[in-house]
């Protein structure tokens, strides 16, 4: 990327045109096009801000002001029943797909909706996002939602083994959390197309995350006591479908063998 | 009133026929009969009442119905949740997806969001609801207290999302949204010993400790709640400053193809304050290490 300032660039152009005046018309057309594009860029930015302003005012008039009891209560405290892990993908907002109203769901969103295993330093981010709703807010349900055409899962499936890290250092470091899912799919589904493998991996990665949830002691103890339910889901926005399943984890009473 | 007060109290209930049907069904098919197979869809709020009534009808004293609340989730409740999810999804499909099918079809091929939003996971501050983002508008990261770790260290969760949205999706705007009564910021402000690694929450929110230090420097004489509010806003600016520490983000901001914005949603009085990072003015400040300069500040109410 050039670090030349626009003043230097204009100066250079001026010098060129003074030497080759027949380029004048071409230059004029290109400069006009560039100016139009820059104007549009600027107005796009204004549009972006106007967009969220009108979104907020719409929310305030049609939702907030029409439900004063709800919002007064939420201002004091929240009692969500759900903790949801969803992908940061712009197409899969859980509030849209599952119509969660404000106050219903504590929602964590990251690349490929992953839950890493317990690690106090490396994964304090997700750990905190689990610890707070579970131990402080006492949510009753955890839902991990995978989705179709997930860029994170596709990236995971595309990583060649034993190659040097690429320039997407953070992404690769993060998505390898679900490497067990990729390994399984590469083995069990090796005859499928890459696209079908990815779809299977999207669901298998959810299962890896569900398993990882149990590595957190405060999750496991509540699941065993039946105070917390863990579910996985897959939202397919190509077909318009939503699959939902549950993690069944319990210990049966011991019986003496002797 | 007759010997079965339960039934009479139900009949005063506007949804009584529904609940009554449920009880009768229960009696015929036994207590393990799943609600799923009844023809009538019973709203969640009344399922809870129905459960209470079932306990009452079994001959126990009304006082014991208190025990029915807060009891461990049982299999029947699980079926309720599945049913609930199903209704929610089908409503979305009918009211939004099918109505705008062309748009969803295009989105299925690729997303081209204009925004990367970094917001708190708090159930009260969903950016789609509060700012009206539609599917395809905003790549959204949500973590505790909407914090951004520094480029050089810290967990990779948020950083991977930055990398993807900025370098692959080429978003034009990053919006960091903080909010009132943030539990994460409160935990940060209450933390006594920063080395305290007993909990995940502490290990994570310490990422925002510079915001706490700057708050204590200027606002330590205020009431704790006001200090927290100050820190909520300071933390947003601190995160914006951190974003400029990512070389590929700074490069794009410098070129003008990426703008950084801060937003503060106050759900107590329902206002939204928004501001934009003034990169040119910030560059001078950055050398002094004293934060960022902002412009275009406005409050929507």
UniProtKB/Swiss-Prot annotation, chain A:
InterPro entries: Beta_CA_cladeB (IPR045066), Carbonic_anhydrase (IPR001765), Carbonic_anhydrase_CS (IPR015892), Carbonic_anhydrase_sf (IPR036874). Strongly expressed in aerial tissues including leaves, stems, flowers and siliques, and, to a lower extent, in roots. It comes from the Eukaryota. GO terms for molecular function: carbonate dehydratase activity; zinc ion binding. It is found in: Cytoplasm, Cytosol. PANTHER family: BETA CARBONIC ANHYDRASE 3, CARBONIC ANHYDRASE. Belongs to the beta-class carbonic anhydrase family. This is Beta carbonic anhydrase 3. It comes from Arabidopsis thaliana (Mouse-ear cress). The lineage of its organism: Eukaryota, Viridiplantae, Streptophyta, Embryophyta, Tracheophyta.
UniProtKB/Swiss-Prot annotation, chain B:
GO terms for biological process: carbon utilization. The modification Phosphoserine is found at residue 128. InterPro entries: Beta_CA_cladeB, Carbonic_anhydrase, Carbonic_anhydrase_CS, Carbonic_anhydrase_sf. One of its GO terms (cellular component) is chloroplast. The modification S-nitrosocysteine is found at residue 231. Residues 1-56 form a transit peptide. One of its GO terms (molecular function) is carbonate dehydratase activity. It is found in: Plastid, Chloroplast. Belongs to the beta-class carbonic anhydrase family. Reversible hydration of carbon dioxide. This is Beta carbonic anhydrase 5, chloroplastic. It comes from Arabidopsis thaliana. The lineage of its organism: Eukaryota, Viridiplantae, Streptophyta, Embryophyta, Tracheophyta. The gene is BCA5.
């Amino acid at each position: 990327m050039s670090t030349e300032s626009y003043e230097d660039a204009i100066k250079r152009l001026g010098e060129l045109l003074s030497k080759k005046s027949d380029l004048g018309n071409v230059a004029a057309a290109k400069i006009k096009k560039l100016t139009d594009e820059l104007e549009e860029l600027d107005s796009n930015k204004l549009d972006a801000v106007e967009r969220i302003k009108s979104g907020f005012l719409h929310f305030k008039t049609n939702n907030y002001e029409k439900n004063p009891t709800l919002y007064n209560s939420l201002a004091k405290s929240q009692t969500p029943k759900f903790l949801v892990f969803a992908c940061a993908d712009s197409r899969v907002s859980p509030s849209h797909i599952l119509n969660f109203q404000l106050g219903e769901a504590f929602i964590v969103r990251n690349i490929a909706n992953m839950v890493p295993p317990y690690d106090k330093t490396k994964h304090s981010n997700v750990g905190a996002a689990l610890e707070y709703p579970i131990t402080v807010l006492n949510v009753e349900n955890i839902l991990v939602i995978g989705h179709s055409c997930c860029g994170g899962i596709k990236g995971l499936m595309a990583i060649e083994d034993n190659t040097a890290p690429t320039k997407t250092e953070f992404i690769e470091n993060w998505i390898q959390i679900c490497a067990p899912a990729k390994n399984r799919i590469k083995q069990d589904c090796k005859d499928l197309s890459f696209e079908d493998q990815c779809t299977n991996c999207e669901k298998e990665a959810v299962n890896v995350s569900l398993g990882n949830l149990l590595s957190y002691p405060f999750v496991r103890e509540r699941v065993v006591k039946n105070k917390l339910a863990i579910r996985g889901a897959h939202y397919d926005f190509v077909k318009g479908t939503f699959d939902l399943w549950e993690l069944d984890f319990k210990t049966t009473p011991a019986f003496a063998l002797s | 009133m007759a010997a079965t007060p339960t039934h009479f109290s139900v009949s005063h209930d506007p949804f009584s026929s529904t609940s009554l049907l449920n009880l009768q069904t229960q009696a015929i098919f036994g207590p393990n009969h799943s609600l799923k197979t009844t023809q009538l869809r019973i709203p969640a709020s009344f399922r809870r009442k129905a459960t209470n009534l079932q306990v009452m009808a079994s001959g126990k004293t009304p006082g014991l119905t208190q025990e029915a609340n807060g009891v461990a989730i049982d299999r029947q409740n699980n079926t309720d949740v599945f049913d609930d999810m199903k209704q929610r999804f089908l409503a979305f499909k009918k009211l939004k997806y099918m109505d705008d099918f062309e748009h969803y079809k295009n989105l299925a091929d690729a997303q081209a969001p204009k925004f990367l939003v970094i917001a708190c996971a708090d159930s009260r501050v969903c950016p789609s609801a509060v700012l009206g983002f539609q599917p395809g508008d905003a790549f959204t990261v949500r973590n505790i207290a909407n914090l951004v770790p520094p480029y050089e260290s810290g967990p990779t969760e948020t950083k991977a999302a930055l990398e993807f949205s900025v370098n692959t999706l080429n978003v034009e705007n990053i919006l960091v949204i903080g909010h009132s009564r943030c539990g994460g910021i409160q935990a940060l402000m209450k933390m006594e010993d920063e080395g305290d690694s007993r909990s995940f929450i502490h290990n994570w929110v310490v990422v925002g400790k510079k915001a706490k230090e700057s708050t204590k420097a200027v606002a330590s004489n205020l009431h704790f709640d006001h200090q927290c509010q100050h820190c909520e806003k300071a933390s947003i600016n601190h995160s914006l400053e951190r974003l400029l520490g990512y070389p590929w983000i700074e490069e794009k901001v410098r070129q003008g193809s990426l703008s950084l914005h801060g937003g503060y949603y106050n759900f107590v009085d329902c206002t939204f304050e928004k501001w934009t990072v003034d990169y040119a003015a910030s560059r001078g400040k950055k050398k002094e290490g004293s934060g960022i300069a902002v412009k275009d500040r406005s409050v929507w109410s």
